[in-house]
């Protein structure tokens, strides 16, 4: 039995008083002080971990101003505040103690657009890709690019002055910020925009907080103008945080305070809104993927690409390429980056040309390609091949792979993981190759592996050395390498921070600014935040205050992780290896990962949040001397002793009375998971939440009773076959209002599905497929076996959507094969989802033995529901290991593709069909939609894939009363719009859950693709 974890770091009374008074004064946002909420805000995309005291989620600038006004009261003068956006920073920019002000949950509105003047006004929590999706119909985009664009907020981009691919032409975020609305500590609203210097000087004479700010910045930047120009490196990725260089324009006629705030990392004010310059979308885009025999060759050849007037040149090394090959993303780009015969590709330059004149762009591209052919023929520059991508869709897939590179590096095998700490250095592009040669020599001298990729056109290369931060010696080495890289970048006239901000690396600021200019930064900080209460420890302390800076060797995630025994870390890899990349925060409703995060906007309910909580739970168990691996081994095979039952009942009673246990907070996060498994493939680290969720639930319920519904769900495969013998009787009973009311109130289940009428057994009466014995199957000759298909049943389709199975049997017959309906054998997936892992292992072993016996017959076995079929491949393998055997159950599309291989494609005509894939299917098997389309094409039918996220049902998730609202909300995110837009009778869904959700919400259902094929053939 797991122990009660009754102690968690508390929240000081002053913070609680502040939050209470904040709500009393009309704060309309959310506040959070639970340990779970604070833990999710204690990490970002960096190696650091710092626990805040509380989190607030304002809904408006007025809410932020209220926070700032109350904070200025003397009684709260010791509290500190840190703004936070998407939490994608790689250097701990938004990590701090005190109160986190999260702008991402609610402040995500696009306020107005002026296409004629080319600007848009947004709130700070708007996500970069969200904005570009909005701008696309207007023919514009927000140009600064970054790899985390589908979850990074514009407020975060402004605060770090982010940039990425294309910056040589498009510049940094600060080049596109026309003005911001910021809230100062005290509640004053500061609106910035470029001003004539005379007006700025006049504003500086006002005896107000804003006046003092204008005066300080104006005077310091004017008086130290020459020193600033002399000391700021002449780089595309210029020195920011604080950008003294660009406050005045070159002619000294214009003053813009915006430049101080961009890159300020929340140390000066809360940026709540921004007016942004938007760029017309180029009409023509071409990508040339140039392949090299070494990474050094790719680096040294990059200037040649820039001279060819390319928009951007992105470089990827062999380590990243090889990791991409092992990821789901490679499926989308493999045809665009093919191997060169008899050559090893060790480097890749992704060269983009863009513009409005197609003839001019093609002329530049063709000239480059001719020159590349000459280099290949003469064996020069290490060029071994190239491929052009003329279509926008192909180019976007290439960039999606490149964007995923950061996360892919985190999936490297072994305890040492490539980590960020010196990953965005910038040097003059002409020195990049030599600089990287020295950088590599430095890492090689320590015997480290590393991955490299980046923006070689701008002289920025992302370098991530692999270190095990659970090893104290390697943690020390990280600081040593940081110091060496600082010296190396200085040697080449570069910067340590090319695009990701300073964060915990701000301790190196004096080395780059010089002591004299660093003193000027402190004066600016003092004008905005004299008492060092906004994100203290970052950028610089205010003048006149001897305050410490954050350090590169501050407390890290590894400091906490190393407290968990190595064996436990290895066995709970899914939770331990999350590196915080945050892809699970993807805003796009059509992306399968992560539905619970999308509907709640609560990061506890994301793979990253769940992994964070489980790591802490494992650490707290270790702190109490409890080994979860030993507990798992000691679990009884079956049954529970009376003593244990009494103890669980007592513990559950105390829990219901409000007795604290951190395990309850973890349980709450796990209960929100739909177990769709999208994270197990979509996440670059392959964080499989359903796997460690099941293990957690199993251990949690050693201490606490399970709800009745868990037992009912886990035994559905036992009672469904019995109920199906009299489906009308049971349906009548289930449909009674009293039964439904009792089910919702006492069991916690709603909208219970009805059994199929007629049942599958009734539909198959007299059909040969249901009446063949094992002996008859074994007696078939080779020719007969080649034409026989074994249909594997699952509990949901066979008993609740039996027509699908019956139609598949008929389809197999129509195609000239002999279908045989195998006896039903429980799959066990429901047991796995609910954490009945011992029972699941028994179920899996029994069914695996049966299917292995069938497999020896040498006939294909096929199932129609993706989630259940894929359970045989994934969960069975984890539970049984080698005892699983070699059996293989095919999905319907896999078998059809093989069976129809020799059949020619017919002329496609008529109305389209529309394919809605199951989350588990399309993420685990990304080629499934195309495979289904190819199958339909063989019969002259067109099948279009509909891009949607999760339907919200996910097995029994949508039937649980506590999930009902979220289940319907998830459906509304993407499925409902598609169903309203498309003809229902032409919509097809492979998942039983998906079809039942459509029927529940829309009133009428959709069919399985095999049913449409049967109709087409008829």
Where are these regions (language model features)?
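A glycine-rich phosphate-binding loop feature that marks nucleotide/adenosyl-phosphate handling sites
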Residues: 88-90, 148-155, 239-247, 314-331, ...
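N-terminal flexible segment immediately upstream of the FAD-binding catalytic core
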Residues: 1-72, 76, 86-118, 147, ...
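Flexible inter-domain linker/hinge segments
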Residues: 2-5, 203-248, 254, 524, ...
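C-terminal substrate-binding/cap subdomain adjacent to the FAD-binding core in PCMH-type
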Residues: 157-159, 167-170, 177-400, 511, ...
């Amino acid at each position: 039995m797991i122990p009660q974890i009754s102690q968690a770091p508390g929240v000081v009374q002053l913070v609680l008083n502040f939050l209470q008074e904040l709500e009393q004064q009309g704060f309309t946002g959310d506040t959070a002080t639970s340990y779970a909420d604070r833990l999710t805000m204690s990490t970002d995309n960096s190696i650091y971990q710092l626990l805040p005291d509380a989190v607030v989620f304002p809904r408006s600038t007025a809410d932020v101003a209220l926070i700032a006004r109350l904070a200025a009261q003397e009684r709260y003068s010791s509290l500190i505040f840190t703004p936070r956006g998407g939490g994608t920073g790689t250097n701990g920019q938004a990590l701090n103690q005190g109160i986190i002000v999260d702008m991402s949950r609610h402040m995500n509105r696009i306020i107005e657009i002026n296409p004629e003047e080319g600007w848009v006004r947004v709130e700070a929590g708007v996500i970069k890709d969200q904005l570009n999706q909005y701008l696309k119909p207007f023919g514009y985009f927000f140009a600064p690019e970054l790899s985390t664009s589908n979850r990074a907020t514009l407020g975060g981009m402004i605060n770090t002055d982010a940039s990425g691919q294309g910056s040589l032409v498009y510049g940094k975020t600060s080049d596109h910020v026309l003005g911001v609305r910021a809230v100062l500590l005290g509640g004053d609203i500061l609106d910035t925009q470029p001003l004539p210097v005379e007006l700025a000087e006049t504003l500086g004479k006002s005896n107000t907080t804003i006046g003092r700010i204008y005066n300080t910045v104006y005077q310091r930047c004017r008086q130290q103008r020459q020193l600033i120009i002399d000391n700021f490196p002449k780089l595309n990725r210029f020195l920011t945080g604080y950008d003294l260089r660009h406050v005045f324009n070159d002619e000294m006629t214009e003053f813009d305070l915006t430049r101080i705030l961009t890159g300020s990392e929340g140390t000066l004010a809360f940026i709540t809104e921004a007016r942004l310059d938007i760029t017309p979308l180029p009409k023509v885009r071409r990508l040339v993927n140039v392949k090299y025999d070494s990474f050094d060759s790719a680096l040294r050849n990059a200037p040649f690409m820039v001279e060819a007037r390319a928009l951007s040149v992105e470089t990827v090394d062999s380590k990243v390429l090889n990791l991409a090959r092992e990821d789901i993303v490679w499926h989308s780009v493999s045809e665009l980056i093919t191997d060169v015969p008899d050559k090893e590709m060790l480097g890749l330059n992704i060269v983009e040309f863009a513009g409005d004149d197609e003839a001019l762009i093609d002329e530049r591209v063709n000239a480059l390609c001719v020159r590349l052919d000459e280099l290949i023929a003469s064996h020069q520059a290490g060029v071994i091949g190239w491929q052009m991508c003329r279509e926008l869709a192909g180019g976007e897939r290439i960039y999606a792979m490149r964007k995923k590179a950061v996360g892919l590096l985190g999936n490297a095998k072994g305890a040492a993981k490539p980590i960020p700490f010196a990953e965005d250095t910038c040097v003059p592009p002409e020195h990049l190759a030599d600089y990287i040669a020295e950088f590599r020599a430095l890492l090689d001298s320590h015997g480290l592996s590393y991955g490299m990729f980046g923006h070689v056109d701008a002289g920025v290369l992302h370098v991530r050395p692999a270190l095990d931060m659970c090893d104290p010696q390697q943690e020390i080495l990280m600081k040593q390498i940081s110091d060496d890289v600082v010296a190396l970048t200085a040697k080449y006239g570069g910067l340590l921070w090319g695009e990701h901000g300073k964060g915990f690396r701000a301790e190196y600021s004096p080395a780059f600014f010089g002591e004299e200019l660093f003193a000027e930064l402190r004066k600016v900080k003092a004008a905005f935040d004299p008492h060092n209460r906004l994100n203290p420890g970052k950028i610089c302390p205010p003048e006149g205050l001897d305050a410490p800076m954050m350090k590169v060797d501050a407390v890290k995630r590894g400091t906490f992780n190393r407290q968990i025994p190595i064996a436990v870390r290895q066995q709970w890899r899914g939770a331990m290896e999350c590196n915080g990349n945050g892809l699970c925060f993807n805003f796009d409703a059509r992306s399968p990962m992560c539905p619970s995060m999308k509907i709640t906007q609560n990061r506890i309910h994301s793979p990253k949040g769940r992994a964070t909580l489980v790591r802490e739970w494992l650490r707290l168990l270790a702190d109490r001397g409890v080994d979860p691996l030993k507990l798992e081994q000691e679990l009884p095979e079956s049954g529970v002793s009376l003593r244990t039952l009494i103890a669980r009942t007592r513990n559950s009673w105390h829990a219901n009375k409000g007795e604290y246990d951190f395990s309850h907070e973890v349980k709450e996060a796990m209960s929100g998971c739909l177990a769709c498994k999208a994270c197990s493939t979509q996440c670059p680290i392959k964080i499989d939440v359903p796997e460690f969720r099941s293990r957690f639930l199993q251990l949690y319920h050693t201490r606490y009773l399970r709800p009745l519904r868990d037992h009912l769900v886990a035994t559905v495969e036992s009672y469904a076959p019995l109920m199906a013998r009299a489906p009308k009787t049971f349906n009548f009973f289930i449909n009674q209002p009293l039964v439904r009311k009792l089910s919702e109130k006492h069991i916690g289940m709603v909208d219970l599905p009805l059994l199929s009428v007629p049942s599958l057994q009734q539909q198959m009466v007299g059909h040969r497929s249901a009446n063949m014995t094992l002996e008859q199957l074994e007696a078939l000759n080779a020719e007969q076996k080649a034409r026989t298909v074994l249909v594997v049943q699952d509990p949901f389709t066979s008993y609740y959507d039996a027509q699908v199975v019956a139609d598949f049997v008929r389809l197999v017959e129509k195609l000239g094969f002999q279908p045989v309906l195998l006896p039903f054998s429980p799959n066990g997936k429901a047991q796995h989802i609910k954490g009945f892992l011992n029972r699941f292992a028994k179920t899996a072993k029994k069914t695996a033995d049966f299917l292995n016996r069938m497999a020896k017959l040498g006939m294909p076995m096929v199932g129609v529901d993706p989630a259940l079929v894929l359970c045989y491949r994934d969960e069975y393998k984890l539970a049984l290991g080698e005892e699983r055997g070699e059996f293989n159950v095919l999905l319907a599309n896999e078998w059809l593709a093989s069976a129809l291989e020799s059949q020619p494609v017919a002329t496609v005509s008529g109305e389209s069909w529309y394919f809605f894939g199951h989350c588990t299917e399309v993420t685990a098997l990304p080629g499934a939609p195309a495979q289904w389309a190819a199958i339909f094409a063989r019969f002259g039918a067109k099948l279009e894939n509909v891009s949607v996220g999760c339907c919200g049902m996910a097995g029994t998730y949508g039937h649980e009363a506590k999930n009902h609202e979220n289940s319907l909300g998830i459906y509304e995110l993407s499925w409902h719009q598609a169903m309203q837009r498309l003809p229902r009778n032409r919509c097809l869904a492979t998942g039983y859950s998906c079809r039942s959700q459509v029927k529940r919400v829309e009133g009428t259902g959709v069919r399985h693709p095999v049913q449409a094929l049967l109709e087409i053939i008829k």
